[in-house]
Structure formats: C-alpha cells, structure tokens
Amino acid sequence: MANESNKTVKVRLVRGLRGAQSRHRLSVRALGLNKLNDVRELKDSPQVRGLINTVHYLVKVEE
C-alpha cells in the first residue's frame, strides 16, 4: 500500500491553449502547466487523472 501512494505521473503540455475551451484552460492551470512544454511531476490520484482525461488532447503523460 505504501508504494501506491508514492506513484507519480509526469505531465507535459504539448499543444497551446489558444482555441481551447475555457474549462480546459482552467484544468491545464490546475495541473500547474503554464507554457508550452512545461513538465510537472504530480501525485497519481483520481483527481489528477480526471484533469488529465479532460485535457488529454493537450498533454502528454509519462508514467
């Protein structure tokens, strides 16, 4: 169980936000991504996975 809580996900913003829906822009900001090619290492949780699924076409995920 302790190993599961330490899992992280790397998320990279690979497409610009111009033309994206405002809700999707907010989801990208919530992930901590600001500029193109920004990378964040986030804790793997259902909340983070939901945000990633919302903007799957804007980001690239590395396990």
Curated annotation (Swiss-Prot):
Could you state one GO biological process linked to this protein? translation
Q: Name one GO cellular component term.
A: cytosolic large ribosomal subunit
Q: Name one GO molecular function term.
A: structural constituent of ribosome
InterPro entries registered for this protein in UniProt: Ribo_uL30_ferredoxin-like_sf, Ribosomal_uL30_bac-type, Ribosomal_uL30_ferredoxin-like
Keyword annotations for this protein, in alphabetical order, are: Ribonucleoprotein, Ribosomal protein
Tell me which family the UniProt entry assigns to this protein.
Answer: Belongs to the universal ribosomal protein uL30 family.
Subunit annotation? Part of the 50S ribosomal subunit.
Q: What is this protein called?
A: Large ribosomal subunit protein uL30
* Species: Stenotrophomonas maltophilia (strain R551-3)
